[in-house]
Structures are given as C-alpha cells and as structure tokens.
Regions:
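Short stretches within intrinsically disordered, low-complexity N-terminal or propeptide regions
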Residues: 29, 61, 271, 311-312, ...
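Extreme N-terminus of proteins, especially the signal/transit-peptide cleavage junction
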Residues: 1-7
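Serine/threonine-rich intrinsically disordered cytosolic regulatory regions enriched
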Residues: 237, 248, 275-276, 284, ...
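Conserved beta-strand-loop-alpha-helix hinge in the C-terminal portion
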Residues: 225-256, 260-268, 273-276, 296
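ABC family nucleotide-binding domain
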Residues: 7-206, 212-221
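Long, low-complexity, intrinsically disordered segments
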Residues: 297-310, 316-340
Length: 340
C-alpha cells in the first residue's frame, strides 16, 4: 500500500476582494485545495483568472480577505510581518518571470545571497552555490553578471538561487514567460529535476497548457474559482543539462606559453576568484534586520534595496583599501546602516 504523502499547503475557502470605487472585484473566490510534499503543482489559467493573486496569497505576499492558508501546518495569516518574513526565508523559495537577479553581483554571488540570511559561513555557502550552478549547467559562467548572460541563463541562475537553501516549497510565477520555446523546455526540465532531487514542492503559475505536462497536479483557475483539479500520475520528468555552458572565449585552445610546464593562465570568466568581494555577513545581516523593522522583509521582493546595500558595502570596502594605501583610512564613511 502506497504511503500517503504529507500535506504541505492547505488552502481553505480563500477569498481576495479588491475595491475599485464602489465596485468589488473578487480576484479569488472561495478556493480550497491541498498540495502534497514533493508535488509539482500548476495553477493554470488565462490572464486575469486570479492565478497569480492566489500564488501571492499562498506565499504570504498578499493578505486574505477571508479564509485561511496553512503552510507546513502553520496559518500564515496569523503571523505578524516579521514572523512571516522569517517563515518565508526559512521555508520558501521564489522563481520569477523577470529573473530578479541583483545586477551588481555575479551569478555565483546571486546564488550565494540567500545563504547569507541563514548565517552559513563563507566557505560552505560558496561550495553550495558552485554545486547549484553546475547543476544548471552554468559552472563556466559563475563570474558573469546578469547583463552578461542571456535570458535563459539568467533564469537558470534564478532557479539555482531559489533551490540553494533547500526550501520546502518553491513558488514560480510564469518562470518561462520571457523565454523562447526551446529555452522554456530547458528551464522546465531543470525546474522539475531540481524539485525531484530533494523532494521539494513546486507551485507554478502558468497560462501555457503545454507546460502542465510536467505537473503532478493541475488546478484550473477561471474567474477566481477552481474550475477543475487534475491529477497526472505519469507527469513528464525533468533532467539536468548534460553539458556545462562555457563562454565562447574559453573554447579556444591555446598553446602553453612555456612548453613542458603547466600553463598558469586562468580564464577569469570560468574560475572562481578567491578574492571576490562579497558583503560582510554581519554588515549585510544588519541591513536585513533594519529592513525587517520597517515593515517586513523578503529577499526576492526587496532586490533593489539589497542591491543598494550590497553595492554600498562593496564600494566602501574598495574605498577602504584605497584609503589604507593612501593613509586616509580615518576619512571613510561610517553610515553603512543607512540604506534608503
């Protein structure tokens, strides 16, 4: 007899109503369902059906008008902002249509970043991030920044970042919306394979019925209500890339500068720099706590603030090094906690 799977998400008569003047709009209207551990669940619907609003409610991004949502047995509607933010950090991961990578950081640093908030040491988090980037076929692009990567590559970094801290649940909102058809299938393969590897739950919003072939459960949403729920015991499985992308410049074979001796030249695009500047753990943690105290914090939804904080710390560290060389260390700004 097959063992019954553990329920990790339970939605009970969820309702979300918006007001536009005197008019009430029922974005989510009395929805109830469960999602089990390790399940790949798709919320399928057309634009305006309420599927993204439902995802935001499940993730605690928006508040219910009525009803209740339990994540891992805990009612998220009863949590205050700080407890909810901490709960999301500990249990949830996010993949977005717009990638939401931090532009001033490399692929490796973007994947490492969620681990900072778990107070994981530099060496361990670096190792975890490298492993995740290799899983998604980007071991050769760890030092590339978002602007140096294609949309598909950026989304793979986003997937690696979402899964690196091993969250119980990953929410994905139209993760292939900005990708071409070939890259879409590659990303879906990786998303499903990553979830299966550690028995993680994925809830994905999509308008594309073709993508639901990867789903174990399909919840069809229409006008804020559940039209039907389909179970697919033989859903399409995913796979990790069978190759590792390498920048074109690395593919050129070069003769050793001194035959007979090991060539010491290293391509900086493919190697992890030992001296990569990464925000000090305690400093960036204080930035997070300061943000939490002003109304709640979520890693992916606060990327602009985090980018500003991270870039400021990076700039000040560089400035401090320059000042030391010039004997001007006393003139370095001390207001690193003031992030707007």
């Amino acid at each position: 007899m097959e063992e019954k799977k553990k329920t990790v998400i339970e939605v009970r008569d969820a309702k979300k109503v918006y007001r536009m003047g005197q008019e009430k709009i029922k974005a989510v209207d009395g929805v109830s369902f469960t999602v089990e551990e390790g399940e790949f669940c798709c919320l399928l619907g057309t634009s305006g059906s309420g599927k993204s609003t439902l995802l935001n409610l499940m993730a605690g991004i928006e508040k219910l008008t009525k009803g209740e949502i339990l994540i891992k047995g805990k009612s998220i509607g009863k949590m205050n902002e700080n407890k909810l933010a901490k709960f999301r950090q500990d249990n949830l991961g996010f993949v977005f249509q717009s990638y939401n990578l931090i532009g001033s950081m490399t692929a490796l640093e973007n994947v490492e970043f969620p681990l900072v908030f778990k107070r994981i040491g530099t060496g361990k988090r670096r190792k975890m991030a490298i492993e995740m980037l290799k899983n998604v076929g980007l071991g050769g692009r760890m030092q590339h920044k978002p602007k140096e990567m294609s949309g598909g590559q950026q989304q793979r970094v986003g997937i690696a970042r979402a899964f690196v801290a091993r969250p119980a649940i990953v929410f994905a909102d139209e993760p292939t919306g900005n990708l071409d058809s070939k890259t879409t299938l590659e990303v879906m393969d990786m998303l499903k394979a990553m979830a299966r590897k550690n028995n993680q739950t994925v809830v994905m919003v999509t308008h594309d019925k073709k993508l639901t072939e990867y789903a174990d459960k399909i919840i069809n949403i229409l006008d804020g209500k559940i039209e039907s729920i389909e179970i697919q015991p033989n859903s399409k499985e995913g796979k990790f890339p069978e190759y590792e992308e390498t920048p074109a410049e690395e593919k050129k074979t070069e003769k050793p500068s001194n035959p007979g001796k090991k060539d010491k030249k290293k391509d900086k695009a493919s190697k992890v720099k030992k001296d990569t500047v990464f925000p000090n753990l305690e400093d960036i943690q204080s930035e997070v706590e300061a943000t939490q105290n002003t109304g709640g914090f979520d890693l992916q939804y606060e990327t602009e603030k985090l980018e500003a904080a991270a870039q400021k710390l990076i700039d000040e560290e560089k400035a401090a090094k320059m000042a030391e060389q010039d004997g001007l260390s006393e003139m370095i700004s001390e207001d690193t906690n003031n992030v707007s």
